[in-house]
């Protein structure tokens, strides 16, 4: 018996810009006015959050997702992707978990090394803010998807 090798086409991640002129203009203006680094830290935390979603997406479906950058943030395009509630739970919880892990890592490093810094605390707090805001159970945020996956799992366990 011979085994057939699965040939997977490697597809690059596409980054789509919604209202590209407005998005890039706002980003350039805000970054040029960001003297304290608040926006850069928030942008780094948002990229970390979405990267975790993209890595879990890659692990589950063996391809990279399409990303959309708009004036309101970065999001993964999931239209047309068949997803079980368990996969939805894994995918939705990856971003907030990455933010929590980054926060704990920075705080633990500062505690063990004895090197406390304002920027370290700011990075930790911003990660908590990004992760916590995404845990709100509002449509479009990770919290709604996590609740859907959890309720489905609980409902499935208690059926007779």
Named regions from a protein language model:
Residues 1-160:
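Hydrophobic transmembrane alpha-helices and their immediate loop junctions
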């Amino acid at each position: 018996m011979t085994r057939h090798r699965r040939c997977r086409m490697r597809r690059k991640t596409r980054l789509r810009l919604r209202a590209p002129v407005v998005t890039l203009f706002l980003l350039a203006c805000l970054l040029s006015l960001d003297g304290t680094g608040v926006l850069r830290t928030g942008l780094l935390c948002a990229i970390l959050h979405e990267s975790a979603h993209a890595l879990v997406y890659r692990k589950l479906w063996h391809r990279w997702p399409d990303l959309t950058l708009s004036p309101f943030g970065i999001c993964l395009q999931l239209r047309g992707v068949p997803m079980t509630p368990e996969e939805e739970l894994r995918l939705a919880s990856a971003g907030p978990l990455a933010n929590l892990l980054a926060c704990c890592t920075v705080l633990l490093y500062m505690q063990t090394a004895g090197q406390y810094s304002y920027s370290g605390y700011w990075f930790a707090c911003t990660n908590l803010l990004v992760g916590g805001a995404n845990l709100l159970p509002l449509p479009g945020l990770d919290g709604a998807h996590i609740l859907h996956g959890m309720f489905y799992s609980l409902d499935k366990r208690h059926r007779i």
